[in-house]
């Protein structure tokens, strides 16, 4: 059973042979969102609220979509 503090993959994308995904780590006081490209963490950012972290992840997803990335399962 998952709890509200379990890490969750928010989205997965690909472009050619490259892959990307965002993972969110809810926590007490801070929520961390991370981005991985080709299985390597590119960056991690901490936010004061879950809503801010989700908004940032969506912003990055939108940038990738405009850059030719496609959503995958």
Language model features with spans:
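A charge-rich, low-complexity, intrinsically flexible signal that marks solvent-exposed coils, linkers
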Residues: 3-5, 73
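Edge beta-strands of extracellular beta-sandwich domains
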Residues: 45, 72-73
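N-terminal acidic leader/helix
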Residues: 5-21
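A short, exposed loop/beta-hairpin motif centered on an aromatic-Gly-Thr core
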Residues: 38-52
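Short aromatic-glycine-(Arg/Gly/Cys) micro-motifs in beta-strand/loop hairpins
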Residues: 18-42
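Short, surface-exposed linear segments at secondary-structure transitions and domain or protein termini
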Residues: 30-33, 51-60
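Short arginine-rich
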Residues: 58-71
């Amino acid at each position: 059973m998952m709890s509200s503090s379990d890490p969750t993959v928010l989205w997965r994308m690909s472009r050619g042979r490259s892959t990307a995904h965002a993972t969110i780590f809810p926590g007490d006081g801070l929520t961390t969102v991370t981005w991985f490209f080709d299985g390597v963490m590119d960056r991690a950012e901490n936010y004061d609220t879950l809503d801010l972290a989700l908004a940032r992840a969506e912003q990055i997803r939108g940038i990738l979509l405009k850059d030719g990335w496609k959503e995958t399962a």
